A protein has these predicted regions:
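Structural signature of the two symmetry-related core transmembrane helices
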Residues: 59-73, 277-292, 372
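Helix-loop boundary and gating motifs at the non-cytosolic
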Residues: 1-41, 200-237, 241, 247-251
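C-terminal membrane-cytosol helix-exit motif in multi-pass small-molecule transporters
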Residues: 162-180, 378-386
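Helix-loop junctions at membrane interfaces in 12-TM secondary transporters
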Residues: 75-88, 294-305
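Intrinsic disorder in cytosolic terminal tails and internal cytosolic loops
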Residues: 386-404
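Substrate-agnostic recognition of the 12-TM MFS/MFS-like secondary transporter fold
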Residues: 1-11, 32-47, 64-65, 87-148, ...
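Juxtamembrane intracellular "pre-TM" segments in multi-pass secondary transporters
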Residues: 177-206, 232-239, 398-404
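C-terminal transmembrane helical hairpin of 12-TM major facilitator-type secondary transporters
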Residues: 276-317
């Protein structure tokens, strides 16, 4: 439940506050959108340090979440524009740094043949909480005001996010988790050696970098497209008033409602299907949803695009979170995930700045076509790994154990 509430923060509400309350410029908004990148890039360092300290993955994730809770608690008490940016950067860094540890917990507790099914089943709780909370919070933020601006600084929202992280910290501390083994080394970025030594892993990451940039470049612009539409009046005009409630409906409730339906399907397909075919199908839905979203000015068109995004994102979350468990040696899952997150951090940092810069130069509709083209091209390159995907689907080992 806590992760669903926090999902609405990082995908919608923090940027909404940046646009409609603080009225930040493009650089500040891109910084907030890219805030989690640092935590991703620090993944190898976190894994190395946790192994060195002898903590279990659950203990480490709990402490990181508790630190993020403290950041949001501070933001609930102080309404300062620069403290807001700094607090968001630190909170998201701590939150995303825990991801490789959580993936290792999945590896240890979910059987390989049913990992996708179990992941998608537990994700249902998160999806319901995200959809419900997103719609409710959007309605409260609108506050009966027909204008497009927030009526006041939503300190209560920051307090809820702090509570969600605190609850996540408690839950992590109670999870069955083990200490990391085989990850101690001479330097904290030692895990990056797997990028060099594992050819298939390297090719997947390169393709993922390209279609990830195509997707992430436009991801934060969805909030900008709706909440700051007046700044782009020469390019498009929305046929409705984008209040916080309607923005939450389009960007939070509809995608999550669709995810609730499709998440079990993608979870089962992840366990049974060729991974590369699955990833390409998901990328097709991402590309279509982006093009439709940024070519729509009506509520109907945007809602359809949001639904297609929900279809893609429901499977994308399973694939993104668990794919390394298919290709990495069991004891190196956290290492492989930390490398995946390191490169994810690079594209998470680059993409928002690139997107906010380009939308000032070309219409969002044209930018969506460029992104879709990048997604399709890199997906075709990824599909060249089809034979390897068949071996994984049949349960054959692809990666030899690499000596420590």
């Amino acid at each position: 439940m806590a992760s669903g509430i926090l999902e609405t923060a990082f995908t919608t509400f923090l940027l909404l506050i940046a646009v409609q309350w603080f009225e930040f410029g493009a650089t500040a908004k891109a910084t907030i959108a890219a805030a989690g990148a640092l935590g991703f890039m620090l993944g190898p360092v976190v894994v190395s340090k946790v192994a060195e300290l002898g903590w279990t993955t659950g203990q480490a994730a709990s402490r990181l979440a508790l630190g993020a809770a403290g950041c949001f608690a501070l933001l609930s008490a102080v309404s300062d524009r620069w403290l807001f940016i700094g607090g968001i950067i630190l909170a998201t860094t701590l939150g995303t740094a825990a991801i490789p540890l959580v993936t290792q917990i999945y590896q240890e507790n979910y059987p390989s043949r049913k990992r996708g099914k179990y992941f998608s089943s537990t994700a249902m709780i998160r999806i319901v909480s995200a959809a419900t909370f997103g719609l409710l919070a959007g309605w409260i933020l609108t506050n009966g005001d027909s204008s497009q601006k927030l009526a006041s600084y939503p300190w209560w929202l920051m307090l809820i996010f702090a509570s969600a992280f605190a609850w996540a910290s408690f839950c992590f501390s109670k999870l069955p988790a083990k200490k990391l083994t085989g990850t101690k080394g001479t330097h904290p970025f030692r895990s990056l050696r797997f990028f060099k030594e594992d050819k298939l892993f390297r090719h997947i990451l390169i393709c993922w970098m390209l279609f990830g940039i195509g997707n992430l470049m436009l991801f934060p612009l969805r909030v900008e497209y709706l909440a700051n539409s007046g700044a782009y009046a020469d390019d498009y005009t929305l046929s409705f008033k984008p209040t916080p409630a309607t923005i939450a409906l389009i960007l939070v409730f509809i995608p999550n409602a669709v995810k609730l339906i499709f998440s079990p399907l993608w979870g089962n397909l992840f366990d049974k299907m060729n991974f590369f075919v699955l990833r390409v199908i998901l990328n097709f839905f991402f590309a279509v949803s982006l093009v439709l979203f940024f070519h729509s000015t009506s509520m109907v068109g945007l809602c359809i695009a949001a639904g297609l995004f929900g279809v893609a994102n429901s499977g994308g979350e399973v694939a993104w979170s668990l794919w390394v468990t298919k290709f990495a040696p069991a004891k190196h899952v956290a290492d492989y995930m930390s490398v995946h997150l390191f490169f994810n951090g690079i594209r998470n940092f680059i993409s928002p700045f690139l997107g906010f810069w380009l939308i000032g130069l070309i219409p969002a509709s044209n930018l969506s076509l460029f992104s879709a083209g990048l997604i399709v091209a890199s997906s075709l390159a990824l599909l060249s790994n089809y034979p390897s995907g068949e071996k994984v689907r049949r349960g054959a080992a692809l990666t030899e154990e690499i000596s420590d």
